[in-house]
Amino acid sequence: LYIYQMTRYYSNIVGKYVAQVTSAIKKLSGLEIKLICPSHGLIWRKDIAKVVSLYSTWAQLLPEEEGVVIVYGSMYGNTAKMAEIIGRELNAQGIKEVKIYDASKTDHSFIVAEIWKYKGLVIGSCAHNNSVYPKVQPLLHKLENYGLKNRYLGIFGTMMWSGGGVRGIEAFANGLKGIEVIAEPVEVKGTPKVEDVARLENIARELAAKLIAERN
């Protein structure tokens, strides 16, 4: 539980300063550290090496575990349905850790912490004023600001007229180095149809194949 809170604090507060963290770890590498006394949190008297190792991993923006975070914004429930379809297929393909979050209901600090932990990320948004849904946009801004990398990304969303949600997520992905977009983004008009389900499941299958291929 406390490790999770460490991840949440690091990813949301320290995440932008990866270069400084890496530099500090190198400077301290020759010292025998007996205590870690952070300005926020518990004092560490043991497991020092584990704490330093975690910070080193986080500073490199390396995922800790195999798994996928699916986060979406939905006005009428259609984008939420798409998220569930992808999540179920990921489970069916053998990915056990699949976390699905509604960006309108879960505080983004918790979502960011989970994204820091897992290699797979799938983001979905309905179109809103020719752009990304307002509850998803701040999350994209945070991840862009932190320079997220070393992740596989799937993209999906819904539209009725000119779209904009999927287009906005694609622009976000194009602005980041070290993010690999998996499969073709899926944009659906209204509620997902049978053919749309197949395309969504394809995102899940391709993402699962990438993750499984990296198993030791």
Q: What spans do the regions from the language model cover?
A:
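A short acidic (Asp/Glu
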Residues: 48-49, 81, 166
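Cofactor-binding loop segments of dinucleotide-utilizing enzymes, especially the Rossmann-like FAD-
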Residues: 72-75, 103, 157-158
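Conserved beta-strand elements of the Class I
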Residues: 67-71, 154
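FMN-binding flavodoxin-like domain, especially the glycine-rich phosphate-binding loop
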Residues: 1-43, 85-101, 111-216
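Flexible, glycine-rich phosphate/dinucleotide-binding loops
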Residues: 77, 107, 162
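Short, charged N-terminal beta->alpha structural module
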Residues: 71-92
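Short gly/ser/thr-rich secondary-structure transition/capping motifs
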Residues: 53, 100-106
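Short N-terminal or domain-adjacent regulatory/targeting segments
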Residues: 35-64
